[in-house]
Amino acid sequence: MNPVEPLAAPQRQHLRYLLEQGLPLASRPYRVLAERIGAGEDEVLEQVRRWDEDGLFRRFGVILHHRALGYTANAMLVLDVADAEVDAVGRALAHETIVSLCYRRPRRLPMWPYNLFCMIHGRERGEVERQIEALLERHALRQTPHRWLFSLRAYKQCGGRYTAPPADLERRHG
């Protein structure tokens, strides 16, 4: 084992591969991962902490499959917010419990004037429309150019994949 790292190189590769597949749904997911790579839970937690400190993770988050949970009315609210205000408006909207995702993107003029995007999920279209109307009212955005776009189709969601599976992993777990 490398004295600098809590896990040996093959264990690190296996752990990275498993993390990219998603955390197991368990009360102690890192213990489950530790068992799968033949290590201790503390070693796995320490390795993840070091990777985080080293900047290995750009984002570590949850991907919810909303449709499987009954949230079939999913809308992207797009707004054309003044550049001087977009960061503050984005932060305010991101704190709303109904907003699952909020981010800024460059406008693509002349066809696409919107620079702020918010995802809102609901069980029925009318429910989502009412939530959007209330959101616009609460944040005084009714006069800000905006549209809401409902999803017509669900695409596969998954996190980034950067690690090839370890060669012996396919034989053991494939």
Curated annotation (Swiss-Prot):
Mutant lacking the gene: phenotype: The nirDLGH mutant lacks dissimilatory nitrite reductase (NIR) activity. The NIR activity is restored by adding purified heme d1.
Protein EC: 4.1.1.111
Principal EC category: lyase
Listed InterPro entries: AsnC_trans_reg2, HTH-Siroheme_Decarb, NirdL-like_HTH
Domain of life, per lineage: Bacteria
Gene Ontology biological-process entries: heme biosynthetic process
Biological or metabolic pathway of the protein: Porphyrin-containing compound metabolism
Keyword Lyase: yes
Name of the protein described by the UniProt record: Siroheme decarboxylase NirL subunit
Keyword Amino-acid biosynthesis: no
An MF annotation (GO) of this entry: lyase activity
UniProt subunit comment: Probably forms a complex composed of NirD, NirL, NirG and NirH. All proteins are required for the total conversion of siroheme to didecarboxysiroheme.
Family: Belongs to the Ahb/Nir family.
Protein function: Involved in heme d1 biosynthesis. Catalyzes the decarboxylation of siroheme into didecarboxysiroheme.
Matching Pfam families: AsnC_trans_reg2, NirdL-like_HTH
UniProt keywords, alphabetically: Lyase
Catalytic activity, as annotated: siroheme + 2 H(+) = 12,18-didecarboxysiroheme + 2 CO2
